[in-house]
Amino acid sequence: MQEGKISQIIGPVVDVDFAEGQLPSILDALTVTRQDGSKLVLETQQHLGEERVRRIAMEGTDGLVRGMSAKNTGKPIQVPVGEEVLGRMLNVVGDPIDGKGPVLSKKSYSIHRTAPKFDELSTKAEMFETGIKVIDLLEPYSRGGKTGLFGGAGVGKTVLIMELINNIAKEQSGFSVFAGVGERTREGNDLWHEMMESGVIDKTALVFGQMNEPPGARARVALTGLSIAEYFRDEEGRDVLLFIDNIFRFTQAGSEVSALLGRMPSAVGYQPTLSTEMGELQDRITSTKKGSVTSVQAIYVPADDLTDPAPATAFTHLDATTVLSRQIAELGIYPAVDPLDSTSRILDPNVIGDDHYDTAQAVKQILQRYKDLQDIIAILGMDELSDDDKLVVARARKVQRFLSQPFFVAEAFTGLAGKYVKLEDTIKGFKEIIAGRHDNLPEAAFYLVGTIEEAVAKVKTL
């Protein structure tokens, strides 16, 4: 094992000198043992001449001094993978941070892996059922696809993510991996405790590199989570759900690292390698003939500017977008998904079938018409509308309420049992409302129920 000596430390950037001919490869991991016995992992980023490498630290560089010895591991950062990591919380280098002792996994993967080869990819466009009505009907997720989850603070991103993890774990016996990238430590802590309470933790691996950590950790933690998910896909042939919260922080950390390495900034001060870094991550998230990694990525939009290079680069990779709206949350409709703003590439009759497609378009049409009429209603009131428009408004309001659904993970707050709604029941319910079969039922019957049969039964309790 080659050893070098630390020659310079500037924040998270550490230069190490090696003997001639012993330079580590780019992306190789080095370990430094501090005076208190703790180990620090560094990742090679640049070769500076014949004998010096510049590296980025995965933790704080407190306690490092010039002249310290750094050992080259000869390979990139390795993280534990397999079923042993389920129910555990790890950091970027795969060390447990949940106080439950070491992770006794038999296998480890490098965090830098090549994307699957072209001939290994599955070309079949297939829908991924989530059991959440508004998503399955209007912006269906594709198996092995990438979905962007947009929303401000407090509109229900985390609850939606937890419900997806719960549904995949219980209905499809699937595993989930959650990568917390540069978000608040408090949110990660809340998620950890809520997952333990709701019982979904045993089917989930959590990897965190939060906003108090150096940029090296934040720029790599998404790759750590992805490697864990890839193991389940490639070795066990499973369909895995990968959550990244927040993909913008991944770009932001890359920008910090780039500046520290002295690269010339690109548009809006971002790194010149922005699209390459995003592409390397997103290209690995895909379906193969063995299994799939389906990802849901929360995306923070800086200053609500969708043309900012960071969200704009992420958009090019997405198959579907789920937009959470504060206006809908204010109506008390949860999940607060905006049915008109959210999109999906597979909302296509050739993929999902004519029945599903026609129902989804009819729902969007009636909601759009209701939206157009809202100004008239606000100024003149309902009485000024034609009879046809009154009927449209009545049905649209029922549709809007029927898009809400009680969640398993929110049972403690709503007092209602959670519901997983199968796609055929979702389509059947909305078709009946639009066809006018339930015009005689009050709006309240459709609020926070699962299937249309439950709405009909609820009338008796009102």
Swiss-Prot record:
Residues that coordinate or bind ATP: 151-158
Localisation per UniProt entry: Cell inner membrane
GO CC terms of this entry: plasma membrane; proton-transporting ATP synthase complex
The reaction(s) this protein catalyses: ATP + H2O + 4 H(+)(in) = ADP + phosphate + 5 H(+)(out)
SMART domains for the chain: AAA
Enzyme Commission code: 7.1.2.2
SUPFAM superfamilies cross-referenced by the UniProt entry: C-terminal domain of alpha and beta subunits of F1 ATP synthase, N-terminal domain of alpha and beta subunits of F1 ATP synthase, P-loop containing nucleoside triphosphate hydrolases
EC top class named in words: translocase
Membrane topology summary: Peripheral membrane protein
Pfam families in the cross-refs: ATP-synt_ab, ATP-synt_ab_N, ATP-synt_VA_C
Keywords: ATP synthesis, ATP-binding, Cell inner membrane, Cell membrane, CF(1), Hydrogen ion transport, Ion transport, Membrane, Nucleotide-binding, Translocase, Transport
Protein origin, superkingdom: Bacteria
Record-linked NCBIfam families: atpD
Family: Belongs to the ATPase alpha/beta chains family.
Function: Produces ATP from ADP in the presence of a proton gradient across the membrane. The catalytic sites are hosted primarily by the beta subunits.
Protein name: ATP synthase subunit beta
Gene name of the record: atpD
